[in-house]
Amino acid sequence: MKITIHRGLNQIGGCITEIQSLSGTKILIDLGHNLPDGGGVSEDMYESPENLDYILDGCSAVFYTHYHGDHLGFAAEIHERGVAQYMGPLAIKIMIHLNDHMTYAEKLKDRAKANLKALNEFKTFAIGRKTIIGDIAITPYGVSHSAPDSYMFLIECDGKKVLHTGDFRDHGYLGKGLYTMLEKHIIPQGIDVLITEGTNVGQKSKSVLSEQEISSQFRQIMRKYKNIFILSSSADADRLWSIYRAHN
């Protein structure tokens, strides 16, 4: 098995991982955009059709850990090239709803319509059940993240096992199940290679609040002030639930 990290070793977000078997079967884990820099600008080499053609050459499928833009960013272009795309069932529905809403915006509608055409052809998978692509087996396991329906993948190929964690956390409402899942389903199998995201690696001084703690802070603010305005992602289910709990 050959593992190629196309992007992600020297940056946060925008990670792209290639798994290729000895017989030549090739899949990608995530293919999204770079995260914007401090000025809100994001330059991406895969905006170039030639570069996208190169990374997708011989690729049988792209598996998405979740739908955030640095993981899912070229759905329409990949669809045009005839490569299968896999994502969680709820994640697909969320992205279809989001892009359907975007068709009402003049500047976004063409892109949204192209995305919808691709999303309606997405394939999905089930937790704990293998999806077979050639001689590569991919088993998804659900994890807590700010994007609902996020997954890590156990990949089996050429007698080796790779765990690709995607983005995950233990401070969301479903986070308490992370360690139980690892101890029950992952660790006993034996992992040869671990590929993980490092969003907060090296930030030991950074305080991470749980959603329960955030909800408690919301509640205190709501009791203190009469009129409260909250700006939040409409697709961050945990945060919306934290706001709802604080208000009720």
What are these regions (language model features)?
Residues 2-61, 70-238, 242:
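His/Asp/Glu-rich metal-coordinating catalytic cores
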Residues 66:
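Conserved G/P- and acidic residue-centered "switch" motifs that form tight phosphate/ATP-binding loops
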Residues 246-248:
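Terminal amphipathic helices with adjacent charged low-complexity linkers/tails
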